[in-house]
Structure formats: C-alpha cells, structure tokens
C-alpha cells in the first residue's frame, strides 16, 4: 500500500467545559495549527521522532510499528492547544488507514482518552464529549464563520497535572450545568452572541479553579469593543478572544489596547487564527499530489 498522510488541528483551549450530573464535558474548536504524520513503506528521511504519547497510543491500535513515518507539527506544547490529542489522532488516523483501510474518529478519540484526557478536535462537526473516555454527548452541524485572537504566555504548564473539575472544591459545578444547555440553544438558533456568552461564562467559572492572569481585564476590553467573547484553555494557560468576521475591523484597536496593558508582557505571543472545521483528515499521498 502507498503512503498515507493524516493531519489534525490543534485548538485554542475549549469553547466551554462543564460538569453535568457528575460527568465532565467539553467542546473544542479547530485552529490553523496542526500535527501531521505520513506513514508508508518508504517516506524518506524521518524529520522528527514520535512523541511519547504517540508511541503509547499506537500500542492501543497495533503491537508492531512496521512502517516508516514522518511527523511534523506547529502546535506548541504545554499551553492548552490540544497538542497531545492532535499528535495522537494524527498517528492513529494514519496507522488505521494504512493497516486497516478505515478510520473511525469516535473510536480513535476514545483511544486517546485512555492515555490522557482528550479534546474533540478530531471531529469536523462541533462535538461535545467527555474528555475522560471520549464518549460523545452532542454534535451540531452549524459551522459559524469565526476567528480567535490567541493570547499565549511564554511559560509552559503540565496540562494533565491540574485537579479535575469534578474533584475540585473550588469549581462551581452546579452553575456550570447551564453552559451545555445554552450551547445547544446557541447552535440550534445559530446565535453567535449566545455562543460568545457561553464561552465567557465558562472562562469565569473555571477561573475559580485555575485563575488566569488578567482574565477580567481581557473580558472588560472585549466588552468595551463589543467583541464576541473570551474562551480559555481550562487546564492550560492560553486565552482566546472570539470575533466574528465583521468584528475583524476592530483588530488594530484591540492589539493597540492589549499592547499598552501590563498583560502584554505576560501574554507576549499573540496571533489571529480562523476557526476551522477540518477535524482529522486522512488521505493517500497520491491523492494529495494529483
């Protein structure tokens, strides 16, 4: 069989995360950063070795790595970009297609969750899932045209080391239940304003468990400029400012205000990304070259 290429986007944290009846749920959206794996009998010089979690998860699918591979990524680690999930899904997707000829995103996501709590970046539709087992709670086909201005600090964190929402006495789990309900309403009504509100509320609730520096200042600025909302990496360090396409006209003023605020030295890396709906993409290399 010829070579197979698989890629999976990272995310800027989660649009929202909540606890319902003692069970954790989250929804991640894709951004223009990705992990990519090519496997086959001959793929050329290996550019980068597989990361430890990729090697761990591949053992859930096969007991023999009898193929060559290349691995590339532009997703930062230890920030909340879903880098591990994107890495694992890329190698799983490529291996599954190469060895078995089929790819099941729900199955592969559940395999990732055996290694560590995972995100829903593998799905091309927005998907609410349990990060601990990959079980799907709800999906929507709505694909609003949105952007995110990502605020990234220099420091890295171990995103798996934080206490879970369900175990944290600081997290207001009961209040968070409405996030899931309101997210469903926002999607059914295609209401981007309610969507932004869900994201911001989720960020504020999580701030009681894992405070983000300057979060309230960022939200105040977003409200002053009339932007959509703020979302965060609930177990990471990055923050996202959500914008509609029409609100991109405020980007110059937004960056100017951010750059003159003390938060600029903390969130020193700032970049704009389109929110994408690619999910896990798997193709034969010949199809890519045609």
Listing of model-derived features with the role each one plays in the protein:
Residues 36-38, 227-233:
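Short, flexible, solvent-exposed loop/turn segments with mixed acidic/basic and small polar residues
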Residues 79-105, 121:
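DPxDG-like acidic metal-binding loop motif
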Residues 103-228, 244-290:
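ATP-dependent small-molecule kinase catalytic core of the GHMP/sugar-kinase superfamily
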Residues 6-8, 19, 29-31, 119-122, ...:
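Solvent-exposed alpha-helices and their adjacent loops that cap or buttress functional pockets
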Residues 1-79, 278, 290:
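ATP-binding N-lobe of GHMP and related small-molecule kinases
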Residues 233-240:
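Small/polar glycine-rich anion-binding or flexible loop at a beta-alpha turn
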Residues 5, 15, 36, 128, ...:
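Conserved hydrophobic/aromatic beta-strand scaffold that supports enzyme active sites
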């Amino acid at each position: 069989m010829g070579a197979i290429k698989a890629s999976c986007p990272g995310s800027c944290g989660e649009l929202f995360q909540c606890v319902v009846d003692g069970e954790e749920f989250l929804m991640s959206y894709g951004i223009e950063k990705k992990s990519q794996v090519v496997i086959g009998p001959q793929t050329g010089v290996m550019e980068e070795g597989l990361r430890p979690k990729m090697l761990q998860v591949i053992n859930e699918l096969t007991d023999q790595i009898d193929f060559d591979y290349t691995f590339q990524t532009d997703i930062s680690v230890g920030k909340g970009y879903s880098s591990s999930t994107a890495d694992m899904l890329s190698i799983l997707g490529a291996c599954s297609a190469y060895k078995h000829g089929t790819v099941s995103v729900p199955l592969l996501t559940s395999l990732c969750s055996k290694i560590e709590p995972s995100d829903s970046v593998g799905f091309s539709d927005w998907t609410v899932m349990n990060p601990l087992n990959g079980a799907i709670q709800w999906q929507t086909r709505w694909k609003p045209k949105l952007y995110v201005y990502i605020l990234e600090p220099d420091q890295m964190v171990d995103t798996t080391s934080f206490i879970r929402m369900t175990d944290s006495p600081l997290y207001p789990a009961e209040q968070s239940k409405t996030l899931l309900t309101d997210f469903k309403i926002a999607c059914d009504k295609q209401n981007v304003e309610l969507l932004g509100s869900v994201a911001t509320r989720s960020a504020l609730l999580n701030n009681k468990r894992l405070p983000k520096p300057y979060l309230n200042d960022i939200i105040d600025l977003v409200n002053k400029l009339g932007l959509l909302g703020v979302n965060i990496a609930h177990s990471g360090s990055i923050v996202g400012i959500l914008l509609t396409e029409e609100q991109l006209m405020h980007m110059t003023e937004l960056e100017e205000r951010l750059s003159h605020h003390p938060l600029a030295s903390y969130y020193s890396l700032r970049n704009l990304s389109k929110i994408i709906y690619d999910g896990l993409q798997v193709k034969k290399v010949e199809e890519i070259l045609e």
